[in-house]
Design a protein with these regions (language model features):
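Cytochrome P450 heme-thiolate "Cys pocket" and heme-binding signature region
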Residues: 13, 18, 56-63, 84, ...
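Conserved cytochrome P450 K-helix E-x-x-R motif and the immediately C-terminal K′/meander segment
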Residues: 55-97, 118
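A compact, surface-exposed functional segment
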Residues: 32-64, 70
């Protein structure tokens, strides 16, 4: 069906507010981590200088900036920008270890907890962009999810990564 004018306005507000606030938070934490880790900042700066020189970046430059992108992903791992927004309702009883989550229960997924799991991220509090470089070992699908996961994943995730990288 079609959205009413009020529904359309509400959806526009959600898209706008969800996008700028979370990207701003991610960049704020990224800047703090770069300032606290000058050797990592130097690697990102050198990569940007080598690829761009003095020119303005464009979308074609994204694949040429893997360390910069990895540093942003690592910042979102340590400080997920939407840490409390991931909720789901159990559509059936779920057995998790010795626990049973009854159908209809609200389940909160905590990206911060997942992102600090030492099984997937040794030294989880350390800022190590190398974890996200193209040659790094692959992560399990649910180990890193700053944009959510599955059918309700953030529709703006690719735009957000492009915007933050450029």
């Amino acid at each position: 069906g079609r959205l009413s004018e009020a529904e359309l306005r509400a959806q526009c507000k959600v898209i706008f507010l969800a996008g700028f606030d979370t990207s701003a938070k991610a960049l704020q934490w990224w800047a703090w981590l770069m300032a606290a880790n000058p050797e990592k900042a130097g690697l990102a700066f050198d990569e940007v200088r080598q690829v761009l020189g003095d020119r303005t970046p464009c979308a074609d430059d994204l694949p040429k900036l893997p360390y910069l992108a990895a540093s942003l992903k690592e910042a979102m791992r340590i400080y997920p920008p939407a840490a409390g927004l991931l909720t789901r309702r159990a559509t059936a009883d779920i057995k998790a270890g010795s626990w049973v989550i009854p159908k209809g229960s609200l389940v909160v997924v905590a990206p911060w907890v997942l992102h600090h799991d030492a099984r997937h991220f040794p030294q989880p509090d350390a800022f190590r962009p190398e974890r996200f470089m193209p040659d790094a070992p692959p992560l399990p699908r649910s180990a890193w999810m700053p944009f959510g996961l599955g059918p309700r994943v953030c529709i703006g995730q690719h735009f957000a990564m492009t915007e933050m990288t450029l």
